Structure formats: structure tokens, C-alpha cells
Amino acid sequence: MVLKLGEASTIKDKRKVVLAIKDKLHHRYRLSCAEVDLLDSVSFAEIGAALVSNSPQFGEKVLRDAVSFVEGHYPVELYDVQTHYEIYG
């Protein structure tokens, strides 16, 4: 997900917000998260999240809930969300 960070004025401020989001997504939704792009931008962050599930519907629901949570609980504006899943077996 690509986020515009409204309150960040320095890279340090940005990293605090991004770290808080990643930690909350990990603990609340059991997602593996990382900042994957836009590392030098003060105003924008791109966070990637992943999970493994035996149900594509469950996986998509968890990711939708996580995106909604970020939008509702952090001073950010959502710019882009991309979902990709693979089925093995």
C-alpha cells in the first residue's frame, strides 16, 4: 500500500509512523510487513504485507481489514493498494 503521511516533516518522523503501522499490522493481523519503496521520501511510504493462508477468501479479507484499519487509525491518506495471491497445489 502506498500512503501519504500527513504529519511527517522529517525522515525520522516518517520512520516512527511507518514502524507503528508495521508493528500494529503484525500484532493485530499476523502479517509480515516491510517498507519496500519510497524510502527517501518524507511524505510517502510504501508498505508491503504478506500472509500465508489455506483460503484465498480469508487472505483477502485479512488484507482488506488491515488496509481499513490503517486508514481509520493513522494520519495517512491511502494512494494505492495492490493485492496479489498465488494458489499452490
What are the residue ranges of the model-derived segments?
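N-terminal first-folded block
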Residues: 1-27
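A structural signal for short, well-ordered beta-strand segments
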Residues: 1-3, 47-49, 81-85
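Short beta-strand elements
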Residues: 29-36, 77-83
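Generic secondary-structure boundary/loop-capping signal
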Residues: 2, 8, 39, 75, ...
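C-terminal structural segments of small proteins and small subunits
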Residues: 53-89
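Short, charge-patterned binding micro-sites
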Residues: 34-54, 88
